[in-house]
Amino acid sequence: MKDLTRRKWFVWLTAYWFLFPVAGFLLLAAGVFFGYGERSYIAVHDNMDLFLAQFQMLKNTNSFLAHGVEIPFLGGISRDNLPSEMSLYTVLYMFFPTYTAYVLGILGKILLGMFSFRLLAGELFADKYVIYRPVIYMTGFVYGIVWFFPAFGFAFASIPLCVYFLIKIYRDGGKRWYLALFVYPMVSYFSYHGLFLLGYLVIAIVWLSVRDRKPVWRLMAALVVLAAGYVGCEYRLFGQMLLGGEETIRSSIVNADLSFAQILQEIGTVWKDGIFHADGVHAKVVLPVCVIYFLLLNGRYLYQRQWKKIFHDPFNFVMAFLLFNSVVYGLYDCGPLRRLVEALVPPLEGWQFNRTIFFNPFLWYGALFLVLIRLYDRGIWTMWLANGIVCAAALAVILTPNRYNDLYFTCYNRAYEHFHGTEVDELDYEQFYAPALFEEIREAIGYQGEWSAAYGLHPAVLEYNGIATLDGYLGFYSQQYKEDFRRIIAPALERVEQTRIYYDDWGARAYLYSGTDLSIVQATKTVYATDYDIYIDVDAFRELGGTYIFSRLELTNAAEAGLVQVDSFTARDGSCTVYVYRAAAK
């Protein structure tokens, strides 16, 4: 080993080996997503069925910068209910085609997470940055490649950047750091992270003021600057929340009221596994490493009777923070507490204060980083053990097929096609939206902007292709419209109690539901339905202005339901057939 340490190539490799996995992954991801293009397999849930269609509608209607206009879904939704143009992620969709913007968002999120982590770690451990550099970049890289909720990937990845700005303000107080903090919300999102960052900052201000025995004016100013930044970047959201005056579906959302035992179980589950919107894939490598280290560290403190170190060790602080966020997540399902919060702050009615859990992936990888640098401090062999651990964590993220791992599913499904000579049943991006098919449909039926609805497919497919929809998916729209739309689907809701509860107690998905099957909306080539009848009130459909229904099912009771079949259309590759129906005249 002594001979190796004298060789320049080994010294260089020890310092810069991380460049190979980082560059290799970025090239692989870019090659796969741009190589397969729109034939890639992209996550549907809360992604292609929601935000990608919203961005495409803004593009179709040239409404990114518009004010006082309605977007043609859910009977007409204010532009202010959709993502702000002051978001860097939204800007991508303003200048690039939707699929290209989505891929650039994935790659940008990785770089943002990695360099944000590098800035923060470099600030906290400046004296040993050169030594720790490989695990700084690798831990940041792993955090960056975690497959978060895509529309808010920048917001997740940039958390360390916000912490970095706040530390610089606390230590230096330079004007440039206040300016940086003011524009930081362009890569964040108030409802998911912003309000909590402000809350955590208030706690930090109180704690530091007590510890330092004087007010921390710099952070107090930072609190005002950050809040102003969020208001400026998300002025549309604040306008709707505070000045809208219209009752929204948030007022009718029914949340679970769990027992004490169920709350404890939920706390343990999210601590261990997280949630699908913020799945840090930490349970496979990061959690075991951190738990083992936690036991060894504090076992040693107890054995040596160093009680104070237990409470002053940064690693223990991070682990306690993780537990705190998990406890808050569980307490959200404590009905009396949740209703108290809503009573004290009415604008937050229906708002999920359990989103503290969204910070846990950053904390898990922060805790892992503390373990790794302490291994670095112990010598050459433990240094390479640390390198092995962080590489294992990276492989766990890359190879775990969680909900938003588009790279895994694209590679797997294309490999399956290559070796088996047939495509999988799932629809890829192009097949899901089927733009060529819907262009043919619009021309054939002479579509002129008539209000329509989808049956057996996501309304997002119609929205993406320039078809105005009475149905749709949005977590914040008029309660009155929810009730009006309910009249259309009442016959189906009366037949399936689970569907009735799903709509009445939530209602974000205003869909045409089956009167028999729990779900007939799948992103698959095969239509999985047992009942080809449709159960709707066609008079209510007409009263809301409805004309067309685009269905993946060939309806067996169209005439009885008050519908007339116009025609059927099949994609050139046979992946999808759409049956077009028109509401019969009275």
What does each of the following model-derived ranges do?
Residues M1-A30:
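Start-transfer (signal-anchor) and selected internal transmembrane alpha helices
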Residues V146-G153, F311-G366, V371-L372, Y376:
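Membrane-helix boundary/interfacial segments in multi-pass membrane proteins
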Residues P21-G113, F152-G153, D484:
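Membrane-interface coil-to-helix junctions
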Residues Y404-K586:
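Extracytoplasmic
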Residues V285-L323:
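Hydrophobic, aromatic-rich transmembrane alpha-helices
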Residues L372-L407:
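Signature aromatic-anchored transmembrane alpha helix within multi-pass, membrane-resident enzymes
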Residues M114-L124, I131-R211, L219-F238:
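Membrane-embedded helix bundles of polyisoprenyl
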Residues G232-Y301:
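Periplasmic/ER-lumenal interhelical loops and adjacent helix-loop junctions
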